[in-house]
Swiss-Prot record:
Its cofactor is [4Fe-4S] cluster. This is Ion-translocating oxidoreductase complex subunit C. GO terms for cellular component: plasma membrane. Binds 2 [4Fe-4S] clusters per subunit.
Length: 740
């Protein structure tokens, strides 16, 4: 009785939530044995037929290749691809591949020579004597990948499992409608499949090996039981037919009762799963020494005259396979790669067969039914009831449609296996899987961009750190290379620092003023007076320098001399016109006369010592002489008309006469020494003389018509005469400048 209970426990199966039961439609293709397809004339082999990066090319255009010869090198997760037949490489260019959008990927195009010659094959019949690493390396080198649809490199998967795998599951469920590739393979090649399972078990060394197969494959079940009759290490588990029981997480739960955690892998719970077709490919790679160059493909649908399962070479165009099966396309014919729930429509038939191609479905119009338009979601929750991954498809639909990537990620959209059960039961005909695929692609693109940004940030920070290190090292070198100061320099530096500290201490000391006392500002006043004295000395020195550097202007000197003479005459007139009650101090008068004579001599010396850098204009000199004579006559008339209230001082008169004679001689010398560089225009000279005579007559008439009662003030007359002379000279100078 205990053994019976143990047997029941050992063969127990579990059921997952959700799932659907669509029409199977498997009888169209599982009744005929596997057959070979004639070779196509041209093969297109994409470099990437698996999850991961493409390998490195090792052939060139024009090379001759044999069947099984590697076209790329696979390193790490990169998986190599091999030539499906012998021929010549005619091109290496992008070509549309097995993808919903038929994206162009780099491919090797081979023209077959029809001989189909193999490379030398080296099989390992004694694989049990080989190490685990050698077997994994051979499986990877021969390009074996998961043939159940994912395309994950088998060697990488086995390497990642390591020693923690307790259960090896062989997926033989093949739950999707129409597809019978694994069913037919188990019927025709059951012994080879079991041999491949034993190789995998030898590599992983699990505690148990389970084969999960649905109960709708009776012939395959009987063939496997016949092969496993004498084996006790492999258990065959027959499970109820339910879609999608062939999913990795679903089949793991059905056979073991263990659930794969969200975002995790089956290896996290000690389980590793491989497909039936993958086990067969492992057997051919290890024992037969044949790389994967072909696989079983189901050709089905009412538009195909001879449906069945064929051995299709990788790289064979889909059109070639369909034509060999009697393809009869309708007006709007649709060809689906994969099953009706998880497959995708091909945009054209030149797409090649790849490692993950398990079915080509060409349904008729009756099978497709009437096309139905997408309608709004009614929140019926039928999709949530059918979801085998326990997700909320209606919520994921809204998040995907609204570009709410964070919420979609939080609701575990990555756990969606894209089985299509939700879309199958949706009464609004919403293509939910299409939305989920697009959302996954957008999230993957965002993460890739974030990864690139993080890498760029890391590179930038590393560069900044390197620059900081180089800067610190450079400063350290400069510091170590600096010359140490001598003893006297150190003393000077110390003294300077002491002075600075003393000043700072003085500046920070508070000013205290006692009550009733006035602050002593004598030091500040003395310092200010010293600064003023220094400024005056500096200004005087600068003035002397400017006087020595600047050459005296003759015209300016003459003007200053005239002003000095006017001031002297003004003083003499003031003394002559002074009231008799106010006696003149002889000493003061003598001092003033001496000062006037000194100023006059100084001006005469400046005029005599000035270099004649500019030649005197004869016309200008003549005008000035005429103006001077007119002013002299005017002064004589004023003096003659003035009442002699006071007696004229003989000494002052003698001084004035001497000054007048000196000025007259000076003007005559200037006129005599002036070089006639330019000829005087007679007409202009006559005009100027006439103007001077007119002005003189006008002045005489004004003086004659003056009221005798109103006496002329001699001081005002002298000032007016001096101003007139200065203005006349200035006008003459301006005229000369304008003529030049």
């Amino acid at each position: 009785m205990l053994k019976l209970f143990s047997a029941f426990r050992k063969n127990k199966i579990w059921d997952f939530n959700g799932g659907i039961h669509p029409p199977e439609m498997k009888t169209q293709s599982n009744g005929t044995p596997l057959r070979q397809v004639p070779l196509a004339q041209r093969f297109v082999i994409p470099l990437k037929q698996h999850i991961g990066a493409e390998g490195e090319l090792c052939v060139s255009v024009g090379d001759k290749v044999l069947r099984g010869q590697p076209l790329t090198r696979g390193r790490g997760k990169m998986l190599p691809v091999h030539a499906p037949t012998s021929g010549t490489v005619t091109a290496i260019a992008p070509h549309s591949t097995a993808h919903p959008s038929a994206l162009a990927e780099l491919s090797v195009i081979i023209d077959a020579d029809g001989e189909d010659c193999w490379i030398p094959r080296d099989g390992w019949d004694d694989y049990r004597s080989r190490s685990r690493e050698e077997l994994i390396e051979r499986i990877h080198k021969f390009g074996v990948a998961g043939l159940g649809g994912a395309g994950f490199p088998t060697g990488v998967k086995l390497q990642g499992g390591g020693d923690k795998i307790e259960t090896l599951i062989i997926n033989a469920a093949e739950c999707e409608p129409y597809i019978t590739a694994d069913d037919r393979l188990m019927q025709d090649c059951a012994a080879q499949v079991v041999e491949g399972i034993r190789i995998l078990a030898h590599i992983l060394q699990p505690r148990e090996i389970l084969i999960g197969i649905e109960d709708n494959k009776p012939q395959a079940i009987s063939m496997l039981r016949a092969v496993l009759a004498d084996s006790h290490d492999i258990s065959l588990r027959v499970i109820p037919t339910k879609y999608p029981s062939g999913g990795a997480k679903q089949l793991t739960y059905i056979l073991t009762g263990k659930q794969v955690p969200h975002g995790g892998r089956s290896s996290d719970i000690g389980v590793l799963m491989q497909n039936v077709g993958t086990a067969y490919a492992v057997k051919r790679a290890v024992i037969d020494g044949e790389p994967i160059t072909e696989r079983v493909v189901t050709l089905t649908g009412e538009a195909i005259a001879r449906p069945g399962n064929v051995w299709a070479r990788l790289g064979t165009p889909v059109r070639h396979l369909l034509n060999d099966a009697g393809f009869c396309p309708s007006a709007d014919q649709m060809v689906i790669m994969g099953g009706p729930l998880m497959g995708f429509t091909l945009p054209w038939l030149d797409v090649p067969v790849v490692k993950i191609t398990n079915c080509l479905l060409a349904p008729s119009a009756n099978e497709l039914g009437e096309p139905q338009e997408e309608q709004s979601c009614i929140r019926c929750s039928a999709c949530a009831d059918a979801c085998p991954a326990d997700l909320l498809p209606q919520q994921l639909y809204w998040f995907s449609k609204g570009q709410q990537h964070d919420k979609a990620t939080t609701h575990n959209i990555a756990d969606c296996i894209e089985c299509g059960a939700c879309a199958w039961v949706c009464p609004s005909n919403i293509p939910l899987v299409q939305y989920f695929r697009q959302e996954k692609a957008e999230i993957a693109a965002i993460r890739q961009e974030e990864k690139r940004a993080a890498e760029a940030k890391a590179r930038f920070e590393a560069r900044q750190a390197r620059l900081e290190r180089e800067k610190a090292a450079r400063l350290e070198r400069h510091k170590s290379a600096a010359v140490q100061p001598a003893a006297k320099d150190k003393d000077a530096i110390a003294a300077a620092l002491a002075r600075v500290k003393e000043k700072q201490a003085q500046a920070t000391q508070p000013i205290v003023i006692k009550a009733g006392e006035r602050p002593d500002n004598s030091a500040i006043i003395a310092a200010r007076e010293a600064r003023k004295a220094q400024a005056r000395a500096k200004q005087a020195k600068l003035q002397q320098t400017n006087d020595a550097a600047t050459v005296a202007d003759p015209r300016k000197t003459a003007v200053e001399a005239a002003i000095a003479r006017a001031k002297a005459r003004k003083l003499e007139q003031q003394q002559a016109n002074a009231e008799p009650e106010q006696q003149v101090d002889p000493r003061k008068a003598a001092v003033e006369a001496a000062i006037a004579r000194a100023k006059a001599r100084k001006l005469e010396q400046q005029q005599a010592n000035a270099e004649p850098e500019q030649q005197v204009d004869p016309r200008k000199a003549a005008v000035e002489a005429a103006i001077a004579r007119a002013k002299a006559r005017k002064l004589e008339q004023q003096q003659a008309n003035a009442e002699p209230e006071q007696q004229v001082d003989p000494r002052k008169a003698a001084v004035e006469a001497a000054i007048a004679r000196a000025k007259a001689r000076k003007l005559e010398q200037q006129q005599a020494n002036a070089e006639p560089e330019e000829q005087v225009d007679p007409r202009k000279a006559a005009v100027e003389a006439a103007i001077a005579r007119a002005k003189a007559r006008k002045l005489e008439q004004k003086q004659a018509n003056a009221v005798p009662e109103e006496q002329v003030d001699p001081r005002k007359a002298a000032v007016a005469a001096a101003i007139a002379r200065v203005q006349a000279k200035k006008a003459a100078q301006q005229k000369v400048v304008n003529e030049d």
